[in-house]
UniProtKB/Swiss-Prot annotation:
The gene is rfcS. It comes from Aeropyrum pernix (strain ATCC 700893 / DSM 11879 / JCM 9820 / NBRC 100138 / K1). One of its GO terms (cellular component) is DNA replication factor C complex. This is Replication factor C small subunit. ATP binds at G47, P48, P49, G50, T51, G52, K53, T54. Keywords: ATP-binding, DNA replication, Nucleotide-binding.
């Protein structure tokens, strides 16, 4: 392979046109209408990471402009280039350049637009008005509420949903078989649980795990540096049985063996609290979720990982005794 990008499966298997996108059908059908009409408004793509927002923008540009679409598309990552000067200079210069044949506009793609400063967004709003005859803007955001109302009102809104388990696993299976990777079906399930509908993350995990040989559940959790769900459930079950010391030992083992932060452990605990495989009264499950929220907040604020998570296990142990679990 001639470049690093060609070695990355997430790039190798990225859809090139709208016809190649098998998910987000409600979005794709509307975008195809823009291609058919050879015209489009400003667009705002919103949704969680890895759901195909940037891919859809590139596929739309490809179908409008052809193989050389990149010369008619200015792509900026707003989280890296938030300043008002970027908006005023780069976008203004590109907007004034020549338009492609047959299509009367070019495209400015602003990825992570929700990270732009308020001043930069105000400047963008004015540029959108000034160059709307020759330029269309596609804004990509994880949190559309951070986009100022005057910009939102000028855009057609598209919400990208987290990908279904079936869509993610089918894609992973296709890639694994195409690359000649030996894998366990349970490992694909584990990758989906870890990625939470983020296709980009899922493909990257699959590729990383493939370097260890057969893609197994153990290999998957090893490459992402996460504890296996059964290990977290064992820790919680031990606390529920009233053995705080043993539960805390399991906590220490998890954090040291996997190098996990307190926030990472808290997120895994939260996931396992709602697992049907963890047996606990519904009342305690609700109370535990509420208390874990407080622990997570303190961890985010910088509190000590070991102290906060040990406190959670101590609380769980005491509550289980009180409720006679």
């Amino acid at each position: 392979m001639s470049s690093v990008l060609e070695m990355l499966w997430v790039e190798k298997y990225r859809p090139r046109s709208l016809d190649d996108i098998v998910d987000q059908k409600h979005v794709v059908e509307r975008l195809k209408q823009f291609v058919k009409q050879r015209n489009m408004p400003h667009l705002l793509f919103a949704g969680p990471p890895g759901t195909g927002k940037t891919t859809a923008a590139h596929a739309l540009a490809h179908d409008l402009f052809g193989e050389n679409y990149r010369q008619y598309m200015l792509e900026l990552n707003a989280s890296d280039e938030r300043g008002i000067n970027v908006i005023r200079e780069k976008v203004k210069e590109f907007a004034r350049s020549r338009t492609p044949p047959e299509i009367p506009f070019k495209i400015v793609l602003l990825d992570e637009a929700d990270n732009m400063t308020s001043d930069a967004q105000q400047a963008l709003r004015r540029l959108m008005e000034l160059y709307s005859s020759v330029t269309r803007f596609i804004l990509i955001a994880n949190y559309p509420s951070k986009i100022i109302d005057p910009i939102q009102s000028r855009c057609a809104f598209f919400r990208f949903q987290p990908l279904s388990k079936q869509d993610v696993i089918e894609r992973l299976r296709y890639i694994a078989e195409n690359e000649g990777v030996d894998y366990e079906e349970e490992a694909l399930d584990a990758i989906y649980e870890i990625s939470e509908g983020d296709m980009r993350k899922a493909i990257n995990v699959l590729q990383a795990a493939s370097y260890l040989g057969k893609v197994t559940v153990d290999a998957v959790y090893r490459v992402v540096g996460m504890a296996k769900p059964r290990e977290v459930r064992e820790m919680l079950a031990t606390a529920l049985k009233g053995d705080f010391t043993a539960a805390r030992s399991l906590l220490r083992k998890i954090m040291i063996e996997y190098g996990m932060s307190g926030e990472d452990v808290a997120r895994q605990i939260h996931r396992e609290l709602f697992s049907t495989e963890l047996k606990m009264p519904e009342e305690l499950r609700v109370l535990a979720a509420d208390y874990l929220g407080e622990v997570h907040y303190r961890l985010v604020e910088g509190s000590d990982d070991d102290i906060q998570l040990s406190a959670f296990l101590a609380w769980l142990t005491m509550m289980s005794r009180k409720l006679e679990v």
